[in-house]
Amino acid sequence: MKLTCVLIITVLFLTACQLTTAVTYSRGEHKHRALMSTGTNYRLPKTCRSSGRYCRSPYDRRRRYCRRITDACV
């Protein structure tokens, strides 16, 4: 009986800790932790002027595309 009460109190305490950290993260710019990674790393594919150079503008007539990791033309 005592063990059951201790386990219930522990679970409630850990749940409360999770809820307080979730509220702390939602006060910032990002409402949810999962949105942090998608907001900063997501990029649309850009086109390049020539291969080997860094990507400049999203539109180009030569239709070469950038790598998302290195941001270099392919």
UniProtKB/Swiss-Prot annotation:
Q: Which InterPro entries match?
A: Conotoxin (IPR004214)
Q: Does the keyword Transcription regulation apply?
A: no
Residue stretches spanning the membrane: none
Q: Which ranges are cleaved off as propeptide?
A: 23-46
How this protein is processed and modified after translation, per its record?
The native disulfide bond pairing has not been studied. Three isomers may exist: the bead isomer (I-II; III-IV), the globular isomer (I-III; II-IV), the ribbon isomer (I-IV; II-III). They have all been synthesized and their activity tested. All of them show similar potency on alpha-9-alpha-10 (CHRNA9-CHRNA10) nAChR, showing that disulfide bonds does not significantly affect their activity. In addition, removal of disulfide bonds does not affect the activity on alpha-9-alpha-10 (CHRNA9-CHRNA10) nAChR either.
**Recorded domain comment:** The cysteine framework is XIV (C-C-C-C).
Query: Any extra remark in the record?
Result: Negative results: this toxin (both bead (I-II; III-IV) and ribbon (I-IV; II-III) isomers) does not inhibit voltage-gated calcium channels from DRG neurons (Cav1.2/CACNA1C, Cav2.1/CACNA1A, Cav2.2/CACNA1B and Cav2.3/CACNA1E).
| Described purpose of this protein according to its UniProt entry | Alpha-conotoxins act on postsynaptic membranes, they bind to the nicotinic acetylcholine receptors (nAChR) and thus inhibit them. This toxin is very potent on alpha-9-alpha-10/CHRNA9-CHRNA10 nAChR (IC(50)=4.61-12 nM for the bead isomer (I-II; III-IV), IC(50)=7-16 nM for the ribbon isomer (I-IV; II-III) and IC(50)=22.7 nM for the globular isomer (I-III; II-IV)).
Give the family from UniProt.
Answer: Belongs to the conotoxin O1 superfamily.
Name of the protein in question: Alpha-conotoxin GeXIVA
- Source species, please? Conus generalis (General cone)
